[in-house]
UniProtKB/Swiss-Prot annotation:
Family statement drawn from the similarity comment of this UniProt entry: Belongs to the HAM1 NTPase family.
InterPro entries, per the entry: dITP/XTP_pyrophosphatase (IPR020922), ITPase-like_fam (IPR029001), RdgB/HAM1 (IPR002637)
EC number: 3.6.1.66
UniProt cross-references to HAMAP family, sorted A to Z: Non_canon_purine_NTPase (MF_01405)
Record's protein name: dITP/XTP pyrophosphatase
Length: 220
């Protein structure tokens, strides 16, 4: 197994929301996490058909370009009534003609799709957020950590916190959407103290248990 020498790691993302979450999650472990954008790296084309493949594409590109280990995350919303869509194409559903991303439009598109298949009840609107974290090294070696958060899609959107599809995702057992939760509420844990809540925090918790000597307390 490759070692994480030193405290430098590249977060292979240009997504401001993801970068904030990684900074929150890695802060307690003393890592200096710089983004691919900090290094002036371009965004590679995500040509994979699974979360794992896309996470690897991003992490490997950053690791090779910087000579440092790199962490990437590929994530998406998988809705049961839509046969798992948007899935790995979650970000694509937000793309506009000028190449920017409009997640208000993406949430509306998801709601229209649910209405078209007659998904009206909470039971018919179940889904999950999935996140796969890839730790890649310059020589191509890689490890994967997967986290999922089960919940229900609500409409209209609720809350202005978080990012992406957070305002329409109500995690099981809670009365707040991810869009109504603070970062601490959404992550749902502190190292060694509690179980993670969000998909990204659950994936990161597995990474931390494997790589950062985090005790397996409340593991998901």
């Amino acid at each position: 197994m490759h070692t994480l020498d030193g405290k430098k790691i590249v977060v292979a993302s240009h997504n401001a929301g993801k970068l904030r979450e990684f900074a929150d999650l890695m802060g307690p472990f003393g890592f200096e996490a710089k983004s691919a954008k900090d290094y002036g790296l371009p965004e590679p084309d995500e040509t994979g058909t699974t979360f794992e493949e896309n996470a690897y594409i991003k992490a490997l590109a950053a690791a090779k370009a910087t000579g440092l280990p790199a962490l990437s995350d590929d994530s998406g919303l998988c809705v049961d009534a839509l046969d798992g869509a948007p899935g790995v194409y979650t970000a694509n559903w937000a793309e506009t003609p000028d190449g920017s991303r409009d997640f208000a439009m993406a949430m509306q598109r998801t709601e229209v799709a649910l209405q078209e298949v007659g998904a009206a009840s909470a039971e018919q609107r179940k889904g999950r957020f999935v996140a796969v974290i890839c730790l890649a090294f310059p020589d191509g070696a890689a490890e994967y950590y997967r986290g999922e958060a089960e919940g229900t899609l609500v409409w209209p959107p609720r809350g202005e916190l978080g990012f992406g599809y957070d305002p329409v995702f109500l995690p099981n057992g809670f009365d707040k959407t991810f869009g109504e939760m603070s970062a601490e509420e959404k992550h749902g844990w502190k190292p060694g103290q509690a179980a993670a809540l969000s998909h990204r925090a659950r994936a990161f918790q597995k990474f931390a248990q494997a790589r950062l000597d985090l005790p397996r307390l409340g593991s998901a």
